[in-house]
Every structure is written in C-alpha cells, then in structure tokens.
C-alpha cells in the first residue's frame, strides 16, 4: 500500500504545479503529518476504557498511541491536572500515506449514507480536520474487542499556509469532498 506516495510524486506534483502556477518544486504543498485523536469524555475516569481506546487507535494507525493528559484542572468537567483525557497518534511518511490510502479506499466508503467529507474543516492555515463518528469503519477493529463506541478527529497538516492550496492537494490525493450544492 505505498502507491499513494508515488502517485503524489509522479502525478499530483505535476498537476499542482500547473494549476497553482508554482515554478519552484520545493514550494509545492505536501502532506506533512496526520494526527488521529480521541477525547474520552465521560469515560476518562475508567482507565480500562482509556487503554481500550488507545489500543483501538493503535490498531487503526499501525503505530502506538499516546494517552493524553489534562494540562489543567477544570472543576466544571470534573477533571484534575494529569488525568488521562484521550489518546492520539501522529503519523508521518510511509505510515501516513498508508493510513490515508486505507482511509480513502476502504474506510470512508463503509460509512452509511456517505456523501463526501465536509469542505468546512480548514483552519485558515492550510490544515484540514474532520471527524468520524465511529471506529467500526476501519477493517482492523473487531466489534467484540471494543468496550465503548467512539469517534475520532483526523487532522491533516500540510506544508502550505493557504486553504485553497491545501484543498487542491487533498482533492488531487483523492480525498472525497462533498459536492457543492
């Protein structure tokens, strides 16, 4: 599953240079990293569930997940400093492209009534974030092994600081964006 990186090198770069009118190949936008994160919410107090969430994300990403801890105590949310509140994985290079290809080809088509991902997830600096409601769309996740059904946020960080260029890059890589009405 290393075809997406070669597709980027051979075809996407050429199309980006033409469409964005960029002469210097070093200035072409590229995908730098993908961050998969889960907030545990009400389940943050149960360490077994936290371990299960981290294990599930590790299976999906193919890399060990890190359990994130609260930086501050917040009485309204009943969170103390240092308490586990979620898990995340940062993917780069080969694993990043493998995950993206699996997401585009296998996982997103398994979502019920899928009409594309939202175009509104850009942050103004060339990064794109979208959410997935449940982890069962990934083939590595076995229904019997999960304790709690949870979603996840997927953030794609690009080398450009322009949303238009980042959108063009992700679209050419094959991300299925929703059609504009």
Swiss-Prot record:
Part of the 50S ribosomal subunit; part of the 5S rRNA/L5/L18/L25 subcomplex. Contacts the 5S rRNA and the P site tRNA. Forms a bridge to the 30S subunit in the 70S ribosome. GO terms for molecular function: rRNA binding; structural constituent of ribosome; tRNA binding. It holds the Pfam family Ribosomal_L5. Keywords: Ribonucleoprotein, Ribosomal protein, RNA-binding, rRNA-binding, tRNA-binding. NCBIfam families: PRK00010.1. The keyword Ribosomal protein applies. GO terms for biological process: translation. PANTHER family: 60S RIBOSOMAL PROTEIN L11-RELATED. SUPFAM superfamilies: RL5-like. It comes from the Bacteria. This is one of the proteins that bind and probably mediate the attachment of the 5S RNA into the large ribosomal subunit, where it forms part of the central protuberance. In the 70S ribosome it contacts protein S13 of the 30S subunit (bridge B1b), connecting the 2 subunits; this bridge is implicated in subunit movement. Contacts the P site tRNA; the 5S rRNA and some of its associated proteins might help stabilize positioning of ribosome-bound tRNAs. GO terms for cellular component: ribonucleoprotein complex; ribosome. This is Large ribosomal subunit protein uL5. Belongs to the universal ribosomal protein uL5 family.
């Amino acid at each position: 599953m290393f075809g997406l990186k070669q597709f980027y090198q051979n075809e996407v770069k050429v199309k980006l240079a033409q469409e964005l009118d960029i002469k210097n190949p070093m200035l072409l936008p590229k995908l730098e990293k993908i961050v998969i994160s889960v907030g545990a919410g009400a389940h943050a107090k149960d360490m077994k569930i936290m371990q299960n969430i981290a294990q599930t994300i590790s299976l999906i990403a193919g890399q060990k997940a890190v359990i994130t801890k609260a930086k501050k105590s917040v009485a309204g949310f009943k969170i103390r400093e240092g308490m586990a509140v979620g898990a995340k994985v940062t993917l780069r290079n080969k694993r990043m492209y493998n995950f993206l290809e699996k997401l585009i080809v296998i996982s997103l088509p398994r979502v019920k009534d899928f009409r594309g991902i939202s175009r509104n997830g850009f942050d103004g600096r060339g990064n794109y974030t979208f959410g997935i409601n449940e982890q069962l769309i990934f083939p590595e996740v076995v229904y019997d092994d999960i304790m709690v059904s949870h979603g996840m946020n997927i953030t794609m960080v690009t080398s450009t600081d322009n949303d238009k260029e980042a959108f063009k890059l992700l679209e050419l890589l094959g991300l299925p964006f929703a059609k504009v009405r």
